[in-house]
């Protein structure tokens, strides 16, 4: 009897996982707001254009993440990502938004011939890497899902964000807003969109085995008027 149960367990564990794809598009909708004056403070938390960029130069898709915010068994998770980094270069953070699954480590190399001091006061992860010069790096592990806004004590115009997601099923939209998450185990999920300044949107979806689930997000972003 024990051997029979063991055999059944092995068959079940080795069975292929039925999976489908999530495909969709993010449409940006604009609304006029009064032009804001942003003072030299960390209060905006990413609401202002990053690193002094003009609004028309901002890559809004690069500031957007789409991910499954639901529990997925370890047997169904994706392979770990290579080490991600946010470099300090030309008094800017590159990249502006990095996405990692919970438990991942991110490095912060200083490639400027000046000191930087990277820090965050976010609820998901609070840290202060201290002052360090060109050629050195610091690493931090991010265990709790959620957005982590990153700044520099010495250069208030520098800001970036790390979006820590609960699993490996995430993506960022392409240049026209299209996105795809493939190989998702069949089931019901909460699909969330996060934007660096606009926050969260979400949809409840059902992924069928070997099928495609279509999703559309309308992302409201403000356009300042003179």
Regions found by a protein language model. Give the residues of each.
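Extracytoplasmic copper-binding redox domains, predominantly the cupredoxin/blue-copper superfamily
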Residues: 18-226
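Positively charged n-region of N-terminal signal peptides that target proteins for export
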Residues: 1-7
């Amino acid at each position: 009897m024990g051997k029979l149960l063991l055999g059944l367990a092995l068959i079940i564990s080795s069975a292929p996982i039925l999976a489908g794809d999530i495909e969709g598009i993010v449409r940006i909708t604009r609304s006029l707001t009064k032009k804001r004056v942003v003072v030299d403070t960390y209060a905006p938390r990413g609401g202002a254009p990053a690193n002094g960029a003009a609004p028309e130069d901002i890559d809004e898709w690069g500031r957007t993440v789409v991910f499954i915010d639901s529990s997925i068994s370890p047997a169904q998770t994706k392979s770990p990502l290579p080490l991600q980094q946010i470099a300090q270069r030309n008094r800017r953070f590159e990249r502006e938004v990095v996405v990692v699954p919970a438990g991942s480590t991110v490095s912060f190399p200083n490639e400027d011939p000046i000191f930087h001091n990277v820090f965050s006061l976010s609820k998901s992860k609070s840290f202060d890497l201290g002052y360090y010069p060109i050629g050195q790096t610091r690493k931090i592990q991010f265990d709790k899902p959620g957005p982590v806004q990153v700044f520099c004590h010495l250069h208030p115009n520098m800001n970036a964000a790390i979006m820590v997601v609960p699993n490996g099923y995430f993506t960022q939209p392409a240049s026209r807003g299209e996105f795809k998450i493939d190989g998702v185990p069949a089931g019901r999920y909460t699909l969330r969109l996060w934007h660096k300044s606009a926050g969260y949107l979400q949809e409840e979806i059902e992924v069928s085995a070997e099928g495609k689930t279509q999703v559309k997000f309308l992302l409201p972003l403000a356009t300042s008027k003179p």
